[in-house]
UniProtKB/Swiss-Prot annotation:
Active site residues according to the UniProt entry: 119 (for autocatalytic cleavage activity), 156 (for autocatalytic cleavage activity)
Coiled-coil intervals: none
A Pfam family hit: LexA_DNA_bind
Subunit architecture: Homodimer.
Reactions catalysed, as given in the entry: Hydrolysis of Ala-|-Gly bond in repressor LexA
Official protein name in the record: LexA repressor
NCBIfam families in the record: lexA
Native source species: Thermotoga sp. (strain RQ2)
Amino acid sequence: MKDLTERQRKVLLFIEEFIEKNGYPPSVREIARRFRITPRGALLHLIALEKKGYIERKNGKPRALRVSKSIRNKIPLIGEIRAGEKREAIEYLEDYIEIPESFLSSGYDHFLLKVKGESMIEEHICDGDLVLVRRQDWAQNGDIVAAMVDGEVTLKKFYQRGDTVELRPANREMSSMFFKAEKVKILGKVVGVFRKL
């Protein structure tokens, strides 16, 4: 999955969703219109997807393509998050990992982060785990969130009282961090944890 660019991934997802909804694949012009690119640009994406083995096309025939490798449940792993002190935000695509559909919330984007540190061990989130994050910009008290403060990202339990946000570790040996609410940006809520045994 590392071989797909972000745009190619989006084009492939669009093709899969279009086929599921309509029963036939989109035309080159429909792809171009959806992504606000030229038909030639759309065609180049299709050629790249074909070369990489994700679709098969029959030259010269409109709508003559089929998906040979689905990425519907492949979620981007976009780096590490510190379960400890804040860490500089690093969002770069490392890989795509297939996640069972039952873990995914319909209508939401998701991403994976690799956990570094031990501040969430009492919630059974350990160093080296992958956390599945549902992308959203809000949280309820007690939610485990990926949050950004001053350009740095951390994984903590979220609590808000008035205009103060507490980012609380799940480790009795560590202290909470307190911030003005406007300084805290919620990136998403943790909805799953994956661990290699």
